[in-house]
Design a protein with these regions (language model features):
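FAD-binding core/adjacent interface of flavoenzyme oxidoreductases
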Residues: 1-20, 88-141
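Beta1-alpha1 glycine-rich phosphate/pyrophosphate-binding loop at the start
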Residues: 10-89, 132-133
């Protein structure tokens, strides 16, 4: 499925949104979902892009590993989180390049234009140059 992407258009945008500014939000984690919800009542078209079709609530992952919480309780579909918004389109895939001077991103090999870009791709763990620590200290955000 490399290179494939799926359009989960929640509802067709209203006519007034067809020419509204286009906001692209890359990342469906805490920051991306918050940005999306903050723009709910704005006259903008929002495209939310993530590699996964769900938001993972990482603070409860340890409870999944101990059996106190089921996997489904920590992974909420993006559609469920932003599905009530009429100005959102969710795309699944990966942004591989950003061209701020041309206001373009490359998503699954194709260029897309935007008016505003929100990069909310999250963070990763660092081992301060000691990758051998990764074996003994698996990251859990």
């Amino acid at each position: 499925m490399a290179g494939d992407h799926y359009f989960l258009e929640l509802e067709p945008p209203e006519e007034r949104l067809r020419t509204a500014p286009h906001v692209v939000i890359v990342g469906g984690g805490f920051a991306g979902i918050h940005a999306c919800k903050a723009l709910k009542d704005s006259d903008v078209r929002i495209t939310l892009i993530d590699k996964r079709n769900f938001n993972l609530f990482q603070p409860l992952l340890y409870q999944v590993s101990t059996g106190l919480v089921s996997r489904g309780d920590v992974a909420t579909p993006l559609r469920e989180l932003v599905g009530v918004q009429r100005n959102v389109q969710v795309l699944l895939g990966e942004v591989t390049q950003v061209y701020p001077e041309g206001k373009q991103i490359v998503f699954n090999g194709k260029a897309y234009n935007y008016d505003y870009l929100v990069l909310a791709t999250g963070s990763g763990s660092t081992f301060f140059g000691h990758d051998e620590w990764r074996t003994f200290a698996p990251p859990m955000k």
